[in-house]
Amino acid sequence: MKRTFQPSNLKRKRDHGFRLRMSTRAGRLVIKRRRAKGRKRLSA
């Protein structure tokens, strides 16, 4: 059976990348929350 997770760095960046996050208000709030929490990685 084919597994559901087929990793691809391109898709990863496109769907969860920093540029995408910054392009919407909700995405910016995500980055803001992660900065406040002190996350080492803010996005994919």
Curated annotation (Swiss-Prot):
Family in the record: Belongs to the bacterial ribosomal protein bL34 family.
Organism: Legionella pneumophila subsp. pneumophila (strain Philadelphia 1 / ATCC 33152 / DSM 7513)
Keyword Ribosomal protein: yes
One example of a Gene Ontology biological process annotation: translation
Domain of life: Bacteria
Protein name: Large ribosomal subunit protein bL34
Pfam families listed in its UniProt record: Ribosomal_L34 (PF00468)
PANTHER family xref list: LARGE RIBOSOMAL SUBUNIT PROTEIN BL34M, MITOCHONDRIAL RIBOSOMAL PROTEIN 34 FAMILY MEMBER
A GO CC term assigned to this protein in UniProt: ribonucleoprotein complex
Keyword set, alphabetical order: Ribonucleoprotein, Ribosomal protein
GO MF terms, alphabetically ordered: structural constituent of ribosome
